[in-house]
Amino acid sequence: VRLRTWQAKLLAPGDPTRRRSRVLAERDPSQLPWSELGVDVVMECTGLFASKEKASAHLAAGARKVIISAPGGKDVDATVVYGVNHDVLKATDTVISNASCTTNCLAPLVKPLHDHIGVLGGLMTTIHAYTNDQVLTDVYHTDLRRARSATQSMILTKTGAAAAVGLVLPELDGKLDGFAIRVLTINVSLVDLTF
């Protein structure tokens, strides 16, 4: 089933320039009009195109660079947490990952600890707001954790955030592990690290 591309124009109230912003919805990023619009950088925040191969569809559509707002794995040009390893960026990078929100919390916490004390290993727990891949009411699911209502349950689940720190700080690769407790808030999370 192919859905049609949806387009609209948005005019922000009170905008003195009276500029209209195009709003687009397209299941296949390679069909977006990035070339026509002169787009330099796409922020890929759907969670559906979180690898270099998949995010490159934006490049095929005419964007010059893509920043994935999720862990991108080892195939992206770089995984970057600003303030921790942003110096690894190169002008030739076309698809980079900004890791996850939890990795962006954990990496700045663990870097100075490792630099000044040394981290041999650690366990991280994140108390995390629920996310859009969770169900809002109890439903059937083969993974019982995924069957519970995000709006009424505290749900223990896995997270790749601790492992993703190894992509940002290679000297810690394989030394951190962690889990998440998804809680009934739509925003705000915290990280607890034992090392």
Model-derived features with residue positions:
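N-terminal Rossmann-like NAD(P) cofactor-binding subdomain of oxidoreductases
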Residues: 1-135, 139-147
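C-terminal substrate-binding/catalytic lobe of Rossmann-fold NAD(P)-dependent dehydrogenases
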Residues: 116, 121-125, 134-195
